[in-house]
């Protein structure tokens, strides 16, 4: 929604510039985790005469105690959670990419296995666990669920989201992947793989974690083309593999629970049981001497931006 801040404001919905880091309100999330919302923060939110929209792809990682803290501190506002429900088989690939963007180093298979080993306890695989928690904290009527896969199939995600927050859709609204000037577009899996490798290098050698690598990679992409980025991309592209995801047992289990327990708050439900193909980079590229050389050159360039 960052691209649409002025258009939202015209209809009375504030998307604050406060707490913005990269593409969302990540600083607000961190303040919630640290129990560090100041009197000024609370006053800004509590005393606003307009509705306020906060968004961060990482709010989902907060636990019940975190949300209870937010509810108790922001005591002059009715907090409504808008949750985009994606079937686990499709979602895990996207969530893994977000983990990498924020400093993760796990391969997709490693990340997926940690959840798949205990599917009934994973809030990533069993969406009902997270949703029940939201209703417990904020109330049953303060949850709106958007069927992401339904919206995606109709190319209506932004429209459906705006409907959920009572905003009238206009063609002037920015849709990220259709606009060359939009922020927070999805990244090619090849670049995700390069960032994953860089995350490991900078965490081990420079104690640099979080989204710093992704931020610098995006900012310096043009310059990195002169340091072997194109050549490294080509090496990784040559070793991509395709796997099918979706229509898993855990998807069927979650689907049944969702349509029985949350039918009244799902905005645009449509059954989803198709199988999709995703691409993954094999880690074998790291054994390629040429790839190692290009990665070292890219690392050297990014190292120049480390604080002294």
PLM feature spans:
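Anion-recognition interface
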Residues: 1-308
